[in-house]
């Protein structure tokens, strides 16, 4: 496998350390740790994690495992973070940060009871630690709320938010001078909406709820796997994660044209979270979906879920810009988003990837019940969370959910289901895209300079109905207002 930029940086750092003097392996590991700490501070998490790994091989300590766990958390590799936190605690049961790291990883995976157990351990050891007490109290609230929600979920007479909305009762203030949605969505309305968002102004709550309710009712009618036909000679565009980077979304349209009946798009999940313009992003997409329902497609990602939205900013942003009721409405709506798309019966598009088990067919996918929060295993979980790996076979996911699947898995699945290749997203790539598995799997990621720190390009894929060979267009990030990523995220648990 070709060396990456990360590999080159790590090699350079290690060469410089070899040129220095050190008394023993313990001191050498400490020097590598110091270098890794600096890369972590500079938010270069790939290099930091690799350097911590080298130091661990030389002289493993609880601190090294704890530090690498933190780097993995930043990379959203929650499974690896859990494993490192366990190792840190095994080496030193009094290492409090090990419990913190494990709790944070479990929080990200929605395993709140396990997280609460670790926060209890920290509070017991550090009873006067205000931060530990705050985390314990907040996690306790979440566990209590989950118990309450589980209890009322058995109430079949409970109405959805959509059923309780009274949009007509929402008054429009005389001072409101933004877009007005009187009847059906029009192209003029959507373009005015984008202009309003670019000027950092809001759509009125009444119109926002009206759009969201219409979108909710529409996506409920869709199948779990949507089938798309691209006619001969016609272009079709596939985009990956956008993650609330509204101004980069607008740049895609500047480069590739606005969505229309002659310029259709598919956005492959993770519309929201992390980027602090997720509200603007999702309402722009909803606008185009309602305007061009048969030419603008949206697939669910792992971040279109309740747990992720609570941790990574979307819930906080919606509450700040609108209301808790709208958060709840989005939660209900996201559960009805399709899980995947099939283009011309040959291109399979999903957010994450393929499956832990052999034998999954397109018909199995069609029959999958998607109206729920993502489970920890099964077809729906794998579609949202899995990643390709370069070696044959399958491996446990470093994310802690889903699996890693090799080229043999992809080849067999494509042959079984008559698929030419798989398009998925879910992972940052330096050029915005990457080919895997001998051209039978492609990653596309459309959030350039992800979180204002990764320096990656974004990309999108174009095909035509008579030429399904993917063509990639990389693009750079564009400026945005001075609101940092994760501005609305749950800072209490380290998710910002």
Swiss-Prot record:
It is found in: Cytoplasm; Cytoplasm, Cytoskeleton, Spindle. Autoinhibited. In the autoinhibited state, the TPR domain interacts with the catalytic region and prevents substrate access to the catalytic pocket. daf-21/Hsp90 probably releases the autoinhibition by the TPR repeat. Expressed in somatic and germline tissues. The gene is pph-5. Substrate binds at residues 243, 274, 302-303, 399, 426. This is Serine/threonine-protein phosphatase 5. One of its GO terms (cellular component) is cytosol. Pfam families: Metallophos (PF00149), PPP5 (PF08321), TPR_8 (PF13181). Binds 2 Mg(2+) or Mn(2+) cations per subunit. Belongs to the PPP phosphatase family. PP-5 (PP-T) subfamily. It comes from Caenorhabditis elegans.
